[in-house]
Amino acid sequence: MEAIAKHRFARISPQKARLVADQLRGKPVAQALEILNFSNKKAAELIKKVLESAIANAEHNEGADIDDLNVAKIFVDEGPTMKRIMPRAKGRADRILKRSSHITVVVADR
């Protein structure tokens, strides 16, 4: 039994979000939530919401017991990049890339 939750177009760089996601892969959901609660990264807050949604999906749609759930898969894919311009001296301009992510969490029983 698997339950999936996604957050698409999350306004965070995939590189930064993967730092948090890699810590959770394969862990029981209780331990994963504990890690996210004590992490002070922006990605932790976003991933925590997705994980809680996946847990709720498993409980509601599949009738799963929360104590038996593990983070089976968690991955962060790159979303679209917004291009912005930062004016610089002497008429120049630098490009700013505002990256976004697609966060996917799959929970399954052990």
Swiss-Prot record:
Gene Ontology biological-process annotations: translation
HAMAP family on file: Ribosomal_uL22_B
GO terms, molecular function: rRNA binding; structural constituent of ribosome
UniProt KW keywords: Ribonucleoprotein, Ribosomal protein, RNA-binding, rRNA-binding
A single cellular component GO annotation: cytosolic large ribosomal subunit
Recorded family membership: Belongs to the universal ribosomal protein uL22 family.
Function: This protein binds specifically to 23S rRNA; its binding is stimulated by other ribosomal proteins, e.g. L4, L17, and L20. It is important during the early stages of 50S assembly. It makes multiple contacts with different domains of the 23S rRNA in the assembled 50S subunit and ribosome.
Subunit: Part of the 50S ribosomal subunit.
InterPro entries registered for this protein in UniProt: Ribosomal_uL22, Ribosomal_uL22_bac/chlpt-type, Ribosomal_uL22_bac/org-type, Ribosomal_uL22_CS, Ribosomal_uL22_sf
Pfam families tied to this protein: Ribosomal_L22
Organism: Photobacterium profundum (strain SS9)
Protein name (Swiss-Prot/TrEMBL): Large ribosomal subunit protein uL22
UniProt keyword Ribonucleoprotein present: yes
